[in-house]
Each structure stands twice: as structure tokens, then as C-alpha cells.
């Protein structure tokens, strides 16, 4: 006689089974499962008890088929090497979880071709929305997807050649805060060290020029277009840097000189460098959360024109 135990796959319990166990109508179970009103606390408790007893789980596939949604979002970053990107992701992930969305993610290694391929692949898998930290350049490959209803939000950089929402740090305001700080310390010859990111460098440079002019300080375009090599010999007493990488480059380039440095965006160990580096800081997790909230509103039916949301910045003087 065999001692083998035969395993029988019992059918999964249905809402009809729950209704029968709880002694209520099928519609009542549906209301409880979907969090709809119209059920007394006592009845809801009885239905929830039946759900627990039977081990019932809602059929997400059927529900999503009815709504035409997949309850998934796609997040595409230009790189994972920057801790700022991970913080953006955390903020977005929290919002997605709160609203019942699963978040897919990928990175492009700052390659526009990979960005297009990855974005369209996520759209082909029917994500409900996209959040993108884009590479510079055109994003018109998303025009047809956005017109087809894929909610899309760009973060840290605005979209180019496509109409979509964007969430950015207040770059122009950040430049003005930095110049005000340096001018307040008595600096008159202030330079700007930009980077390859066209939008951010242009916006910060314009903010610097406005702030310098407002204070009657020299607006020298040569000093507002520095790179690390030119900074090493430039006639400046202070420099504002476009991002973390440029700030570190300025620290190396000005190591033998007494040049005051303010960076846009905080970074690890900035407070431990001698002398410590002042920064114009913004909260990347808040940027991710704000982008997620904006996307959820779009998915809920917000038809307002695309908007650009600016997250506030603050000076951390060191």
C-alpha cells in the first residue's frame, strides 16, 4: 500500500463563496472588497470574517481588465550612480505604494537611444504612467504615447518637443540665493561653473546674471561660462557650480587658491571638506513624491494643461 499523499488542488474561493459564508448578497461582498460605502459595520465585519476564513483574494486580473488599467507605473532614470536619483525613486515609490501601484524601473546610462527604447517598451507593456529623468535632447518619441493616454511626468529636466508635466528644483531661485550669499560675504568677482546639462546650466547662468546685475556687480560672460580648467586661472574670488560633479571639480581646480564655492545640490561629505562647502539644497525625495502625486492626479482624470512644478530650494551655509 502506497504511503504517498495525493494533493488535490482545490478551486480558489470566489466572491460568491464569501457571500454564501457571510449570508449576504454578492453586491455586498463587492462593496466591502472595493471599499465602497453602503455597508453597515456589522455586515462588513461578517464579510471580512468570511474572507479570512476562506482565504479569498480579489482577482486583480479581472478587475484590471474591466478598468482598462494595469496598476503599474514606469520609472526611468538617466543613471543610478547618483544618490540623488535613488532619493527621487524612494519618494515616488512611496506614493505609488500608497495608491496601489506597482513600480517598474530602469536606467539609460544617459543614452538617448536606450531612453527611447526603454520608454516605448514600458508603454508596450501598458504601464498606466511614466516618470522620466530624461537625457538632454528631443523627447518627441513620446508624443503618440502621451496622446494615447499614457500619463507622463519629467523630473529634474523638462521635456523637449513634447507637451508633458515636469517637476524641477527652483533653479533660477537657487542661483539668486547663491549669489546673494556670496555677495553678502563681500565677493564681487563671482563666476559660474556649468555642466553639459543645457537646461540647468542655462537657467542657473541666467539666474546668476540677474542676481549680479540687481546688486550692481560685474556681469562678465567669460566668468559665467567657466569650466574646471578656466577656473584654475580665472580672476574670481567665488564660484557657483551647477551640480555635484561641477562642485567637486571646482574644489580640485581651486585647491591652491582661496576661492569660495557654492554648489547646487548637496552631496555626501560636503560638510566635512576643509573648508566645508556651502550648497543650495533641494529635496530629491520631495521631487519624486511631487511627481508621483501629479501623475496620480492625471490618472484620476485631471485634464489641465501640462504644468511645471518647482520644488523650493534653501541655502545651507557652511
Model-identified regions with their sequence ranges:
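N-terminal helix-turn-helix DNA-binding module of bacterial transcription factors
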Residues: 1-70
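Short beta-strand segments enriched in small/hydrophobic residues
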Residues: 26-31, 65-80, 181, 189-195
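Short, solvent-exposed amphipathic alpha-helices that sit
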Residues: 46, 83-98, 174-178, 199-219, ...
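Amphipathic helical "hinge" segments at domain boundaries
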Residues: 56-121, 126-129, 209
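Flexible loop/hinge segments that line or gate small-molecule binding clefts
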Residues: 110, 132-177, 245, 265-277
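Hydrophobic alpha-helical segments within soluble ligand-binding/sensing domains
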Residues: 165-192, 226-229, 247, 282-300
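An alpha-beta-alpha
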Residues: 176-215, 307-318
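Flexible loop/turn connectors
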Residues: 234-240, 245-318
Amino acid at each position: 500500500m502506497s504511503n504517498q499523499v495525493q494533493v488535490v488542488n482545490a478551486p480558489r474561493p470566489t466572491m460568491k463563496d464569501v457571500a454564501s459564508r457571510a449570508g449576504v448578497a454578492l453586491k455586498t461582498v463587492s462593496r466591502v472588497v472595493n471599499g465602497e460605502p453602503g455597508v453597515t459595520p456589522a455586515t462588513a465585519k461578517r464579510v471580512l470574517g468570511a474572507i479570512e476564513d476562506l482565504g479569498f483574494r480579489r482577482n486583480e486580473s479581472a478587475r484590471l481588465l474591466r478598468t482598462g488599467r494595469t496598476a503599474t507605473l514606469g520609472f526611468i532614470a538617466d543613471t543610478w550612480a547618483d544618490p540623488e536619483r535613488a532619493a527621487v525613486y524612494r519618494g515616488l515609490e512611496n506614493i505609488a505604494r500608497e495608491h496601489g501601484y506597482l513600480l517598474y524601473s530602469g536606467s539609460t546610462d544617459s543614452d538617448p537611444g536606450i531612453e527611447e527604447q526603454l520608454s516605448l517598451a514600458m508603454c508596450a507593456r501598458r504601464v498606466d504612467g511614466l516618470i522620466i529623468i530624461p537625457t538632454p535632447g528631443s523627447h518627441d518619441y513620446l508624443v503618440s504615447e502621451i496622446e494615447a493616454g499614457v500619463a507622463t511626468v519629467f523630473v529634474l529636466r523638462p521635456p523637449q518637443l513634447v507637451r508633458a508635466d515636469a517637476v524641477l528644483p527652483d533653479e533660477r531661485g537657487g542661483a539668486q540665493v547663491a549669489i546673494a550669499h556670496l555677495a553678502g560675504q563681500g565677493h564681487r568677482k563671482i563666476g559660474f561653473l556649468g555642466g553639459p546639462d543645457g537646461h540647468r546650466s542655462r537657467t542657473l547662468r541666467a539666474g546668476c546674471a540677474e542676481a549680479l546685475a540687481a546688486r550692481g556687480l560685474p556681469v562678465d560672460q567669460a566668468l559665467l561660462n567657466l569650466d574646471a580648467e578656466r577656473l584654475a586661472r580665472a580672476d574670481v574670488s567665488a564660484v557657483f557650480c551647477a551640480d555635484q560633479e561641477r562642485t567637486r571639480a571646482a574644489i580640485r581646480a581651486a585647491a591652491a587658491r582661496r576661492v569660495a564655492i557654492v554648489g547646487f545640490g548637496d552631496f555626501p561629505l560636503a560638510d566635512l571638506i576643509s573648508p566645508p562647502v556651502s550648497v543650495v539644497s533641494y529635496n530629491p525625495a520631495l521631487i519624486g513624491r511631487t511627481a508621483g502625486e501629479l501623475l496620480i492626479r492625471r490618472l484620476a482624470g485631471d485634464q489641465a494643461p501640462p504644468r511645471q512644478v518647482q520644488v523650493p530650494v534653501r541655502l545651507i551655509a557652511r
